[in-house]
Swiss-Prot record:
[4Fe-4S] cluster 2 binds at residues 239, 243, 246. Pfam families: Radical_SAM, TRAM, UPF0004. InterPro entries: Elp3/MiaA/NifB-like_rSAM (IPR006638), Methylthiotransferase (IPR005839), Methylthiotransferase_CS (IPR020612), Methylthiotransferase_N (IPR013848), Methylthiotransferase_N_sf (IPR038135), MiaB_methiolase (IPR006463), rSAM (IPR007197), rSAM_horseshoe (IPR023404). This is tRNA-2-methylthio-N(6)-dimethylallyladenosine synthase. It comes from Anoxybacillus flavithermus (strain DSM 21510 / WK1). Its main location: cytoplasm. Belongs to the methylthiotransferase family. MiaB subfamily.
Length: 527
């Protein structure tokens, strides 16, 4: 990843380090970039790109899901990347992180080498997130910062991919304001990367490929995973819930599940490679299997099979309360390698606000689900997502969110101020909660989140917990860091040989968000 200091350094270097004999090459490149505006992009979009439409998107459920299991790099593309390097900057969720692993796998299969320095790259991709406006602004800022690098190197390919690429307004902005971008491709087009690269090398125009059949599942894509301790495994793609504030159903497409045999095979392969923890991924992971027409098979059934595989820990994210059924609770209660941590976004504690959000459950239904989970899985760690300042949210409705948080006693929460997303139903609502009120509500909510987290963490003092050691602490290389089954970060002093292993740690100090401890050698019952 490139931090602000590094960005400024290489931008300054680009602007000052070039001798005058390069001026003609720079001018020639700028002229080439300007020529890109000649194409009639408005006409292009009117014929091949369909903007987000709630009415049209909801019709897509009838489309058959097709499975393609024969992905391979065509011979004509092999060696394309010989002598070239790639750099991918990733924004957003674990799905994007996993998509980056797939793109890195494709790049390396083409012969490219990875680099963590954008100035050394021949291809730069920004894998983007569209969940909030702030995330998009960061990407536009990054595209601007990369302009000097692009001007200096006419052969550099600069691409924007991921969720932002699926939004017409974003693509139009790039076409009009950032003509030096060479490629724009969407979340459904990752498997087309070799073809997109080839066209970008050969074309003088921007390559835009954001439309495709979204009802397919592509198997056997190459991956370059980060590390060899924890791995992500996609089990489904897309979302059909259409919460009024959310852009994901438009950027990620319809819900479509991978076949269980393909998932089981992938997890077995990871277990054989020595991975210690698997996280099953999906925009709405517990809707898994609802699109199958040939069998009744859900996330609970899949987890029941995966728990028999010899891998220490299995997690999943993100779940929707609406699809969290009794079968899944029953299987999770079996324990073993199924961890006692569930991320269960509530978004609001008010039934009225939940109705405006189209979450399709009430406060009471959510609390009943929590009761069943806690009864079946004693000591379970529940975490959540909460939005404050949704249109028309009153003070009383916000108080309901605070009271629900106190009642559930979540271990932690991701909290956000409402951000309207163009193309969603909520964007048409009047955003009538003043920003100062939103900020005050967020501050009050975060104070409660911190208070309960500190209280729950304090209970760990004196306990011995199982920790999967991931590496050195970011703040101190002499300290090791890892996570418990309930996803608590633990820092402790121990030998480097413990990295990648499951060890027992006695907690000596609890902080609001982290635990400090000491490694114990003796066999002891852990929490």
């Amino acid at each position: 990843m490139m931090n602000e200091k590094q960005r400024l350094q290489y931008t300054a270097q680009i602007e000052t380090d070039h001798p005058t004999d390069k001026k003609s090459a720079l001018d020639e490149n700028l002229q080439r970039l300007k020529q890109k505006t000649s194409q009639d992009y408005e006409k292009y979009f009117s014929t091949v790109f369909v903007p987000p439409s709630l009415k049209e998107a909801k019709k897509r459920g009838k489309e058959e899901v097709k499975y393609h299991k024969d992905f391979s790099i065509p011979e004509e593309f092999r060696g394309m990347g010989n002598g070239r390097k790639f750099y991918i900057r990733t924004y957003g969720c674990q799905m994007n992180e996993h998509d980056t692993e797939v793109m890195a796998g494709i790049f390396m299969a083409l012969g490219y080498e990875p680099t963590d320095r954008p100035e050394d790259a021949n291809v730069i991709l920004l894998n983007t997130c569209a969940i909030r406006e702030n995330a998009e602004n960061k990407v536009f800022g990054e595209i601007g910062h990369l302009k000097p690098l692009k001007q200096n190197n006419p052969d550099l390919l600069l691409g924007v991919c991921g969720c932002m690429s699926q939004e017409e307004s974003v693509v139009n902005k790039i076409l009009k304001q950032f003509q030096y971008v060479d490629m724009i491709f969407g979340t459904h087009n990752i498997h087309r990367l070799p073809y997109i690269l080839k066209e970008a090398y050969m074309s003088k125009e921007m390559v835009v490929e954001v439309w495709s059949k979204e009802g397919d599942v592509i198997e056997n894509l190459p991956k370059v995973r980060k590390g060899n301790i924890k791995a992500w495994v996609n089990i489904m793609y897309g979302c059909d819930k259409f919460c009024t504030y959310c852009i994901v159903p438009y950027t990620r497409g319809k819900e479509r599940s991978r076949r269980p045999e393909d998932i089981i095979q992938e997890v077995r392969h990871l277990a054989a490679q020595g991975y210690k923890e698997i996280t099953l991924l999906g925009q709405n992971v517990n809707a898994y299997g609802k699109d199958f027409t040939d069998m009744k098979y859900g996330l609970g059934d899949l987890m029941d099979e995966l728990r028999k595989i010899d891998i220490p820990r299995i997690r999943f994210t993100t779940s929707h309360p609406r699809d969290f059924d009794d079968r899944l609770i029953e299987v999770l209660a079996k324990g073993g390698n199924l961890v006692e941590h569930i991320h269960l976004p509530v978004q609001s504690g008010s039934s009225e606000v939940l109705k405006m959000m189209a979450r399709k459950y009430t406060r009471e239904q959510y609390l009943e689900l929590v009761r069943k989970i806690k009864e079946a899985i004693p000591g379970v760690a529940l975490t959540t997502d909460i939005i404050v300042g949704f249109p028309n949210e009153t003070d009383e409705q916000f108080e309901e969110t605070l009271s629900l948080y106190r009642e559930v006693e979540f271990d932690s929460a991701f909290t956000f101020i409402y951000s309207p997303r163009e193309g969603t139903p909520a964007a048409k609502m009047v955003d009538n909660v003043p920003m100062e009120v939103k900020k005050e509500r967020l501050q009050r909510l975060n104070a409660l989140v911190n208070e309960i987290s500190a209280k729950k963490m304090k209970e760990y003092e004196g306990q011995v917990v199982e920790v999967l050691v991931e590496g050195e602490s970011k703040n101190n290389p002499d300290v090791l860091a890892g996570y418990t089954r309930k996803n608590k970060l633990v820092n402790f002093v121990g030998p480097k040989s413990a990295i990648g292993q499951l060890v027992n740690v006695r907690i000596t100090e609890a902080k609001t968000w982290t635990l400090n401890g000491e490694m114990v050698e003796e066999t002891i019952e852990v929490k």
